[in-house]
Amino acid sequence: MVRRAGALPTWSFIGMIVAVQVADRLLAHQVTFDRLADDVPARDVLRAGQAVGDVVFLAVALVAVGMVLLHSRPRWINAVLVAYLSVATINLVLNVGALVATADQMRVAHLALLWDVGLVYLSTVFVFALWYRLLDCELTGGAFEFPVDPARPDRRPGWIDYVFLSFNTNATFGPTAEVVHARTAKVAMMVQTLISLLVLVVLVARIVGVGQ
C-alpha cells in the first residue's frame, strides 16, 4: 500500500477550494432561485447559509493568497479549511434537503431535473474529495490506504485519487479498492452515501415520473 498523503500543496489546495465554491454556488442558485418560491421560509435559511459560506470562502482565499506570497503554511490553516468545509457540507445538505422536500411539487422540464442531479453529484464529489484529502493528510497514520502503483510503488496519493474515491462513493455507496481506517473518514463516507441515496431514490425517481 502507498504511504499517506503529504502536506496539502498550495495551488492544488486553492484549485479544489474554488471548485467546491463554484459547485456550491451553482447548486444554491438552482435551489433558491429556480426551485423555491419567494414565500418559502427555507429560502431565507438557504440564503443565510450561502452568505456564511461566501464569507468563509473569502477568508480561506485571503489566507491562501498569503500562503503564496509568504511561502509559508501556518498550521492553523487546517482549522480555517475545516470551518469552510463544514459550512460547505451543511449548505450541501440543506440544498439537497430542499430539492428532496420539494421534489413532488416540481413542475419543471426533464432536462432541468437532470441538471439538478448533476449539480448535486458534482458538489458532493468535490466537497468530500477535499474532506478525504484533508483527513488523510492530518490524521495520525492517515485515513486511507490506496492500492500500490507497480510502476511507482513510493508514489503518494494525489488529488485524482481522492476525487476518484469520492466519485466511487457516490456511484457505489462506498469505497472500491481503498481501505478506510479512520472513524472520522467512515462517518464522512456515511454522510456522502446518505446524500447519494437521497438523490437516487427521490430525485431520480422524480425524473422517471416526469418522463412517463
Set out the residue ranges of the language-model regions.
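Outer-pore turret/helix-boundary of cation channels
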Residues: 130-162
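Alpha-helical transmembrane segments of multi-pass membrane proteins
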Residues: 14-32
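Long, highly hydrophobic alpha-helical transmembrane signal-anchor segments
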Residues: 80-129
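Perimembrane loop-to-helix junctions flanking transmembrane segments
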Residues: 32-48
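Pore domain of cation channels
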Residues: 159-167, 173-212
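Structural signature of hydrophobic alpha-helical transmembrane segments
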Residues: 47-60
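N-terminal membrane topogenic signal
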Residues: 1-14
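Hydrophobic alpha-helical membrane-embedded segments
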Residues: 67-71, 119-137
